[in-house]
Curated annotation (Swiss-Prot):
This is UPF0145 protein CCNA_02462. It comes from the Bacteria. InterPro entries: UPF0145_dom_sf (IPR035439), UPF0145_YbjQ-like (IPR002765). SUPFAM superfamilies: YbjQ-like. It comes from Caulobacter vibrioides (strain NA1000 / CB15N). It holds the Pfam family YbjQ_1. Belongs to the UPF0145 family.
Length: 105
């Protein structure tokens, strides 16, 4: 599956548009990670714990997006867009939303 953030691929014309596709991944962040992140943010370090959680959520969302494209018979996803949000009580969960256009090249 070819995946790109651009709306087209030079030299690879779109043969068929299959449609817009969407996927999400929501992961909870536990209290210990929140505390460690707050301490690291306070002293100016990076929060590796949050980075790992976000990377996992992004990977899950992308896998789900690929599955949606495959269901439609696409071999590429164009114009991929990722958005990050917090959801739940007091932003206790992280959500990655991803969208794109499923196509046949």
């Amino acid at each position: 599956m070819l995946i790109t953030t651009t709306p087209f691929i030079e030299g690879r014309p779109v043969q068929e548009y299959k449609g817009a596709i969407y996927a999400q991944s929501i992961l909870g962040a536990n209290v210990v990670l929140d505390l460690l992140a707050a301490i690291r943010d306070f002293i100016g370090g990076h929060s590796k714990s949050y980075e790992r959680v976000l990377a996992r959520a992004r990977e899950d969302a992308m896998k789900n997006l690929i599955k949606e494209a495959e269901k439609l018979g696409a071999n590429a996803i164009l114009a991929v867009d990722l958005d990050y949000n917090t959801v739940g009580p007091q932003g206790s969960m992280m959500m990655v939303s991803v969208s794109g256009t499923a196509v046949v090249l």
